Regions:
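Alpha-helical transmembrane helix bundles of large polytopic membrane transport and channel proteins
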Residues: 269, 279-430
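Hydrophobic core segments of alpha-helical transmembrane domains in multi-pass membrane transport
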Residues: 454-465, 527-532, 610-612, 625-639, ...
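Conserved C-terminal guanine-recognition region of P-loop GTPase G domains, centered on the G4
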Residues: 231-297
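Juxtamembrane inter-helical linkers in multi-pass membrane proteins
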Residues: 480, 484-488, 541-571, 646-670
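Extended, low-charge hydrophobic alpha-helical regions
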Residues: 408-409, 428, 472-510, 554, ...
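Core alpha-helical transmembrane segments of integral membrane proteins
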Residues: 445-545
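Conserved G1/Walker A P-loop phosphate-binding module
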Residues: 136-219
Length: 829
């Protein structure tokens, strides 16, 4: 019995050990990315999520087997910053919880580094001639016959216009390159159906060569408007060539997009940008060998220093004119992981060949997108039921053989190819000076206790310089110029004996109306100068990282903070600044919430009424108005989140670029575009609106010129609206007239009241302090000025603009009525 007891005890002990091992293994297997500690390394084992979100994870390089290091958390604990394949990436904790990882010990991390170094050394030693490739000048046009073989050429007829697509990741210098290639020969517009900027430019020295600057993207998956726009442009407009710019300091990440562009089988040139930084930090890239491995021309450039641009243009013109498609479209073979992915891709290509040709989609590109479950491609191919079943069977078989799901298998295939070619062609630089500088700056600008004070300080400085120093000074000069021109024109019209109505139209309608709006131009240009400096330097990405958590609680993202803050200065640039937001949902919400941030044009109204009715508590009243606007904005954000903008929150997967000094040419080009855009609106929509307001103020219902504004159509309309405001305590028609004039420009409210009432004493006879408080709340919240509404119309369309006008007026009425009602209940008068 003792022997039996001992055997049983040993069995129990062994079973406990086995159970403990199982528990430990289960724990390790189920460890997620969000459980990592700062500085901890791990290997991705499972990528969770579904649909576009999961595909975006994979596109950004988060695939099984990838090593990640948790760099830090945002000051408020969410999101986190990761280092993946040498670049920084942000991820929310909720999204990180969908990614399972396996912890890497310090020893394992060192072994991985040694192994990676050995692989790089092996790749460098594969071909001794490649060791000296960096010393060999890059081949010129026609040399070597590598890409200019007569057999590969399909020349276009002479005189055929050449069109190019300029594509690349965000923050890779694409805009700088576009400006260098085109100079001032640019046209800015929108892609059809979306509010994504489209820039077209004529290549300098090539009158019949047009290049389109496509949005910065990371892949050709239909994850964002930018990616859809890029893909549809290439597939439908069929440019004669693609210029793909990549950041040479982060080449692995950038080549992921390159491979997908090559699958489109369009003549293509690769521009290796920032090669000067690579060399300065002790690294190099064997350009000739990279060309051989990719099968496309590769041109080293520095867009910021205007180096290599002429050679890039020459190669681009050549491959487009002779239609030299990429020599390589296959990035895996039958030896890669048993050939599962290779067989799958080629099997699908055989299956869908005719459909792809009919749909105008390159067959290799279509096959890969079908494996990734791209529904847009599947719909365009119009496969029948049997073909779809066969497609699913081929993909399922590949998943079993490869041991990865379909989307992960394709992403792994691409990144595996990238790692192989980089091992042979890239000599790793030391940690760059730019990265070292960025890490030091981030210790302060994204530090736990310093990030928010720094942000507040920077924005306060921007606002002070814009609205009190530089912008205000330039605005004052422009106002003086407009006033001078108005006076000169007025005297000229009087001297010429021009008809009084025409005189009034020119002076009161055009000069005073359009002139009042034009005076905002210096403010907008100055503000966008600072915003572009912050954006191009990489700081705005850090602001989004820091502010994401509090804004996400009300349905926004970290990127919303800057447009909303700009809205305190002026709603127009606030709305325009929202264009930098990648999410259409967040962009719309941000635009709709911007009017709740009290703009500086309303400040004269606050000062006027607080001085007249609340002289001893003016500061408290004004601060209260700003706070009320923010609180109501938060409330509306929550309502929007539960009604108009329901659905899954857009993940915060964003690359944090190194800090860089923005190029003067790029900043200048941006400021010119913004100024030109504003001027175009000032002399179109705003011009028409001012004429309408002038007409209503000048004529009565019988179209007779009025001598007293009380008889005008505007006064008639105001008298009809007056009963609407009676419950709020300000039912006088003159108040209604001022509010209507405020639709033109908020500064007009005080000016109109001064004209109609004469002095403050007359206003005190009509309004009680309670009614004045109610009126202040209404002015805080009612419809923005015509310039702001025009901006909203341009960004969101007419329906949203009209809805904003009506919605803001309704919200303002309800809030003002609430203030009036509460005042009456507590005995105020």
């Amino acid at each position: 019995s003792m022997l039996l007891t001992m055997i049983i005890n040993k069995i129990i002990i062994k079973s406990d050990i086995i159970l403990l091992i199982i528990i430990i293994k289960t724990y390790e297997a189920n460890m997620t990315l969000r459980e990592l500690k700062t500085g901890q390394s791990a290997t991705v084992t499972v990528v969770g999520g579904e649909g576009a979100l999961r595909q975006h994870f994979l596109d950004m390089g988060i695939i099984p087997g990838t090593r990640v290091v948790l760099t830090k958390f945002a000051p408020m604990g969410d999101p986190m910053e990761l280092n993946i394949n040498g670049y920084e990436l942000t991820l929310r904790l909720a999204d990180a919880g969908r990614i399972e990882v396996e912890d890497i010990t310090d020893r394992e991390a060192a072994e991985c580094e040694v192994k990676a170094a050995a692989e790089r050394a092996e790749g460098r030693n594969k071909d001794k001639t490649a060791e000296n490739a960096a010393l060999i000048p890059h081949p010129g046009l026609g040399e070597g016959g590598k890409y200019h073989d007569k057999k590969a050429e399909h020349p276009l007829p002479k005189g055929t216009p050449l069109t190019f697509a300029l594509a690349g990741n965000q923050n890779c210098g694409k805009t700088t390159l576009f400006n260098q290639m085109t100079g001032s020969n640019q046209h800015v517009g929108n892609f059809p159906g979306v509010t994504v900027d489209r820039k077209d430019g004529v290549i300098r020295g090539q009158d019949k060569a047009l290049v389109t600057d496509l949005p910065g993207i990371y892949s050709m998956s239909p994850y964002s408007n930018e990616e859809i726009v890029t893909r549809e442009f290439i597939l439908r407009e069929k440019p004669k060539g693609i210029i793909n710019i990549v950041d040479a300091t982060n080449i692995e990440r950038n080549l992921f997009l390159t491979m997908q562009l090559m699958e489109l089988d369009v003549p293509m040139v690769l521009a290796l940008n920032m090669m000067d930084e690579v060399r300065e930090n002790g690294g190099t890239i064997r350009v000739n060998q990279l060309e051989e491995l990719l099968g496309i021309p590769v041109v080293p450039i520095s867009a910021a220093k205007n180096e290599g641009i002429d050679e890039l243009i020459s190669h681009s013109i050549h491959v487009a004119r002779y239609q030299e498609s990429p020599k390589r479209l296959d990035f895996c073979d039958e030896n890669d992981h048993g050939g599962a992915v290779h067989r799958c891709i080629h099997g699908i290509m055989d299956l869908i060949g005719d459909h792809a040709e009919k749909a105008g989609i390159p067959v290799r590109f279509a096959a890969c997108k079908l494996i990734e479950s791209d529904q847009m491609v599947l719909k365009r191919l119009e496969l029948d039921e049997n073909e779809q079943e066969m497609l699913e069977h081929i993909i399922t078989q590949m998943e079993k053989e490869r041991g990865l799901d379909r989307a992960a298998a394709i992403a792994d295939m691409r990144y595996s190819f990238i790692r192989r070619i980089c091992a042979q062609t890239v000599v790793r630089p030391h940690e760059s000076k730019e990265h070292i500088r960025s890490r030091k700056m981030d210790q302060v600008l994204t530090g736990k206790y310093t990030a928010i004070p720094c942000f507040i300080g920077i924005m306060a400085l921007v606002f002070w310089l814009t609205f009190n120093v530089i912008g205000a000074f330039l605005q004052n000069l422009l106002e003086q110029l407009i006033s001078f021109l108005t006076t000169v024109t007025d005297h000229a019209l009087v001297s010429a004996g021009v008809n009084g109505v025409l005189h009034s139209l020119i002076i009161n309608g055009i000069f005073n109306g359009v002139g009042s709006v034009l005076s905002f131009l210096p403010i907008i240009v100055t503000l966008f100068f600072f915003l572009s400096m912050m954006e191009d330097s990489g700081y705005i990405a850090r602001v989004a990282f820091v502010m994401d958590k509090p804004l996400r609680k009300i349905g926004l993202s970290g990127r919303s903070i800057v447009p909303l803050l700009v809205g305190f200065g002026c709603t127009v640039p606030g709305v325009m600044a929202s264009r930098t937001m990648p999410s259409e949902r967040d962009r719309k919400m941000t635009i709709l919430l911007t009017p709740f941030m009290s703009c500086s044009a309303k400040l004269p109204i606050y000062v006027f009424f607080t001085a007249a009715f609340f002289p001893h508590s003016a500061g408290i009243v004004m601060v209260g108005l700003y706070v009320l606007g923010v609180l109501l904005g938060i409330l509306m954000a929550v309502i929007y989140r539960k009604t108009l903008f329901q659905g899954e929150a857009v993940p915060f997967v964003m690359e944090l670029p190194n800090y860089r000094m923005p190029g003067a040419k790029s900043v200048g080009q941006l400021l010119w575009e913004k100024a030109k855009d504003f001027l175009q609106r000032a002399f179109t929509v705003i011009f028409i609106a001012t004429i309408i307001i002038w007409f209503l103020q000048t004529f009565d219902a019988h179209l007779n010129v009025v001598s007293d504004s009380q008889s005008s159509i505007l006064a008639l309309v105001a008298s009809l609206l007056a009963p609407v405001f009676a419950p709020l305590g300000f039912g006088d028609w003159r108040i209604s007239t001022a509010l209507i004039a405020g639709f033109m420009a908020k500064e007009s409210v005080v000016a109109t009241l001064s004209v109609l009432f004469g002095d403050v004493a007359s206003i005190r006879q009509v309004l009680t302090p309670l009614a004045a408080g109610s009126l202040l709340v209404f002015c805080l919240l009612y419809t923005p000025c015509i310039a702001a509404i025009t901006s909203v119309k341009r960004e969101l369309g007419s329906k949203w603009a009209i809805a904003m006008v009506i919605g803001q007026c309704v919200i303002a009425w309800i809030a003002a009525y609430g203030v009036h009602l509460i005042g009456v209940l507590v005995g105020l008068s």
